[in-house]
């Protein structure tokens, strides 16, 4: 089977609620996209709202409050919104990387694999049925002499020592207490809605299907980059994909061999090429799914304009499925910076998108300036 990149982009946009825009709930978006990155809360709100024909900026907060969504460390060690019932397989595959077992992790964190095991057991007991701020949790932990040496690292806002606990399903974010984050045990927070933590071999096909359902066609390497920044065992990855057999179809996309779900193959083949403009927020999953190193979606010479210092991913302009520029709001004006080799952008289409960004941002109007 063959497909063009513009067909692939159009199909992905349909699957990701970008074209056409309908009215999905926040949990619909989060489920389809295999999570929404959520280090910057306002950006997560925007990226969900931009996928709604009538943007509902409060949908994320509302669905977190009613426990339809959870916030936890997941893919690539970053904070994500996930559906509680679907989180287990993603977390299982992250735990499977065993990043805390590597000497480099021990050197960087000062915490040994055995101490991570002890922390996991202790935190599971402490958080069962309660919600604690970071300070409250750490204070309880360091009352045990085993954890005294970890106090500074445990109080760190980066949470590197706590991430393996999230992947093992014993810790997630609870409701904020003022400006303080809290943690709790997923099983006690979500009850029957908390899905089980399957073994990696059981989790893998679930996650692969979900990923390809939003970001296919994709290679094994692209999947691993999205999941774990290429930290998963390569033989395991090949086995997981190989075991799916006829559920996957190989597609030749202008010379790149990649996989799509067999159930989606005919739909992809019949998809018309992608056209039009979209303004997407920072850290948007349309780009994070294939990754900023995907040279078809984002030309390598422009990657530095999008993937910035300290892991920041800029809001992007997408034309015909490819990233062709960045944008920002400056003094209540939406400023678009096309890449130098980009053809002139259609002003009316950009202004229409800017109006949608304004609605999703809760402002009345955003005049456009293309620089």
Swiss-Prot record:
Keyword Signal: no
Induction / repression: The gene is adjacent to the azinomycin B biosynthetic gene cluster.
Effect of residue 221 to A: No effect on base excision activity
Disrupted-gene phenotype: Essential, it cannot be deleted.
Record keyword Magnesium present: no
EC supergroup of this enzyme: hydrolase
Transmembrane intervals: none
Alphabetized UniProt keyword annotations: DNA damage, DNA repair, DNA-binding, Hydrolase
EC numbers: 3.2.2.-
Its job: DNA glycosylase involved in the repair of interstrand DNA cross-links (ICLs), which are highly toxic DNA lesions that covalently tether the opposing strands of DNA, thereby inhibiting essential cellular processes such as DNA replication and transcription. Acts by unhooking both sides of the ICLs, forming abasic (AP) sites on both strands. AlkZ specifically repairs DNA damage induced by azinomycin B (AZB), a natural product with potent antibiotic and antitumor activities that interacts covalently with duplex DNA and forms ICLs.
Family: Belongs to the DNA glycosylase AlkZ-like family.
Domain notes per entry: Adopts a unique fold in which three tandem winged helix-turn-helix motifs scaffold a positively charged concave surface perfectly shaped for duplex DNA. The active site contains a QxQ motif and a beta-hairpin essential for base excision activity.
Name recorded for this polypeptide: Interstrand DNA cross-link repair glycosylase
Gene encoding the protein: alkZ
């Amino acid at each position: 089977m063959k497909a063009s990149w513009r067909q692939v982009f159009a199909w992905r946009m349909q699957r990701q609620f970008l074209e056409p825009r309908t009215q999905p709930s926040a949990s619909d978006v989060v489920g389809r996209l295999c999570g929404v990155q959520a280090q910057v809360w306002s950006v997560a709100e925007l990226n969900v709202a931009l996928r709604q024909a009538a943007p509902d900026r409060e949908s994320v907060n509302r669905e977190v409050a009613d426990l339809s969504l959870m916030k936890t460390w997941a893919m690539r060690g970053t904070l994500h919104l996930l559906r509680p019932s679907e989180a287990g397989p993603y977390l299982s595959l992250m735990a499977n990387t065993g990043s805390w077992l590597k000497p480099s992790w021990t050197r960087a964190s000062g915490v040994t694999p055995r101490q991570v095991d002890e922390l996991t057991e202790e935190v599971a007991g402490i958080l069962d049925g309660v919600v604690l701020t970071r300070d409250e949790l750490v204070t309880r932990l360091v009352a045990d002499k085993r954890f005294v040496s970890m106090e500074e690292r445990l109080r760190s806002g980066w949470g590197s020592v706590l991430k393996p606990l999230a992947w093992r399903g014993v810790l997630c974010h609870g409701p904020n207490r003022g400006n303080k984050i809290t943690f709790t045990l997923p099983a006690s927070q979500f009850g029957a809605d908390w899905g089980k933590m399957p073994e990696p071999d059981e989790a893998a096909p679930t996650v692969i299907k979900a990923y390809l359902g939003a970001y296919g066609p994709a290679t094994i390497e692209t999947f691993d980059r999205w999941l774990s920044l290429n930290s998963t065992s390569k033989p395991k990855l090949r086995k997981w994909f190989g075991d799916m057999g006829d559920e996957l179809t190989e597609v030749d996309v202008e010379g790149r061999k990649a996989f799509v779900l067999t159930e989606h193959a005919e739909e992809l083949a019949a998809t018309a090429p992608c056209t039009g403009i979209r303004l997407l927020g920072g850290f948007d999953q349309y780009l994070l799914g294939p990754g900023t190193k995907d040279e078809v979606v984002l030309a390598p010479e422009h990657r530095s304009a999008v993937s910035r210092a300290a892991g920041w991913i800029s809001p992007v302009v997408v034309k015909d499925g490819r990233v062709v520029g960045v944008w920002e709001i400056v003094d209540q004006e939406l400023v678009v910076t096309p890449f130098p080799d980009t053809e002139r952008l259609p002003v009316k289409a950009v202004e229409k998108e800017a109006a949608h960004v304004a609605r999703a941002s809760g402002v009345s109007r955003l005049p456009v300036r293309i620089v």
